[in-house]
Amino acid sequence: MAKAKFERTKPHVNIGTIGHVDHGKTTLTAAITKVLHDQYPDLNESRAFDQIDNAPEERQRGITINISHVEYQTEKRHYAHVDAPGHADYIKNMITGAAQMDGAILVVAATDGPMPQTREHVLLARQVGVPYILVALNKADMVDDEELIELVEMEVRELLAAQDFDEDAPVVKVSALKALEGDEKWVKSVQELMAAVDESIPDPVRETDKPFLMPVEDVFTITGRGTVVTGRVERGVINVNEEVEIVGIRPTVTKTTVTGVEMFRKLLDQGQAGDNVGLLVRGIKREDVERGQVVVKPGTTTPHTEFEGSVYILSKDEGGRHTPFFNNYRPQFYFRTTDVTGVVTLPEGTEMVMPGDNTDIAVKLIQPVAMDEGLRFAIREGGRTVGAGRVTKIIK
């Protein structure tokens, strides 16, 4: 059966739910799909909680990661929504997942207020460049005391302001559970939330005019069709039958041709910046490509092993290191979708770097990574984020 073609009429926006575990991120995601399905039945499918909660597992370096993608539409926009699980072990996914957001819904339980993971997710959203955060104050049906809710709202606004997010962002009181149960008052609250999402998350500035680049997130084989490489197009446009290069991690550059582009299992003539797509690549075996590489327009991006970066090292309170590090520190540098070990050289006159410090460092990676100036990275130790930074200068 031929696949349905995907019509590109409305603005396409990538969003996600972030926040503390058990504050109701997944329940809210389910409630949004149900409420929008009931509001615009011809535009939306409803997704049950357990469909979203049983997110497909991705195993990444020994950690099982779950991430769920759903799509839905309001009158104004088409949304792709990632539900990022809340455990500290899954910060990795926050980094891969949150990097895919044009805006985020921060879910905070009105019964609890901001918790450690709430702060961690907001900090991470800042690090990975999420442009906008608005707030769903969930479980609002369980708090009768108006003053208590106002207090929680104030705390959340302070938290956003502390990371340079919009302090005046919408804070919408919702009850995801009651909305799922069809309680009219709370169904309306979710409609209000989505109206706020439509209004407050800016139309993404799509980077369609830049040369094509897509970080590889996954690679698999489709019997009879060949190898498919999936990821979110970071910039530019890819058309069927265009030549590309696969760059980074390995010593040689692989050249190939894209013979098909698909999104949400629908065929497209092209994929463009911001789209989560699968690219069918000609003459490439599954083992020829791996996560951490990038697919690019030929000749536009080169892999590098040495760079200078400006970094922030998390304080102990933010879940970072408890002790300073010195010259020749060897953490992992997390670029786009993968970790690469690197050796750090501190600036002259700097003996050590304390948790909570900002500093400039020079780094020598053990594998090449496709990079440009301005590229963001996380610094990690055994899967735990201990710092964040951006490339300021490429050396080699």
Swiss-Prot record:
GO terms for molecular function: GTP binding; GTPase activity; translation elongation factor activity. Keywords: Cytoplasm, Elongation factor, GTP-binding, Hydrolase, Magnesium, Metal-binding, Nucleotide-binding, Protein biosynthesis. The keyword Glycosyltransferase does not apply. Mg(2+) binds at T26. Residues 83-86 are annotated as: G3. It comes from the Bacteria. It is found in: Cytoplasm. GTP binds at residues 19-26, 83-87, 138-141. GO terms for cellular component: cytosol. Its main location: cytoplasm. Residues 175-177 are annotated as: G5. GTP hydrolase that promotes the GTP-dependent binding of aminoacyl-tRNA to the A-site of ribosomes during protein biosynthesis. PANTHER family: ELONGATION FACTOR TU, MITOCHONDRIAL, ELONGATION FACTOR TU-RELATED. Monomer. NCBIfam families: EF-Tu, PRK00049.1, PRK12735.1, PRK12736.1, small_GTP. This is Elongation factor Tu.
